[in-house]
């Protein structure tokens, strides 16, 4: 459905000073919430970044058990430990919900590599099963999930 090995990489020096720069610590674990937005002008970042676009699903491959996944609300760039996915005809919030599901988190954790800093490998990510109901059903599922989470808060 998406390729876990493909991301558009850019040098930090090529980014506009007003670009949104997303780092791992900006995403709350297990919630899908953005904690803060930083701009290039506020950082001293010199490392390469992955580009992303509004509507992309941003997935942290580092320490998959932290379950850090958001949907981008504007274009920007992120650490190379975050993968930017364009799910095309799949509802992006449904894709986010699936990537955050216990099923996928367990799958990602079962074959991560690295002891101190485990990561989900591209091959394992590409082989993941992805249940794909019709688009209207994807929207209904997300609406139900959001309704249940509202009741929790």
Task: Label each PLM-derived region with a short phrase.
Residues 1-14, 131, 135-143, 150-153:
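Non-catalytic DNA-recognition/assembly elements of restriction-modification systems
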Residues 27-29, 64-65, 90, 135, ...:
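Short, glycine-/Ser/Thr-/acidic-enriched flexible segments
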Residues 17-19, 77-80, 115, 123-125:
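Short edge beta-strand segments in beta-sheet-rich domains
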Residues 48-50, 57-104, 109, 120-123:
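A short beta-sheet element
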Residues 60, 143-146:
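Solvent-exposed alpha-helix faces
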Residues 110-114:
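Short amphipathic beta-strand starts and helix->beta connectors
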Residues 2-12, 20-54, 72-74:
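Sequence-specific dsDNA recognition surfaces
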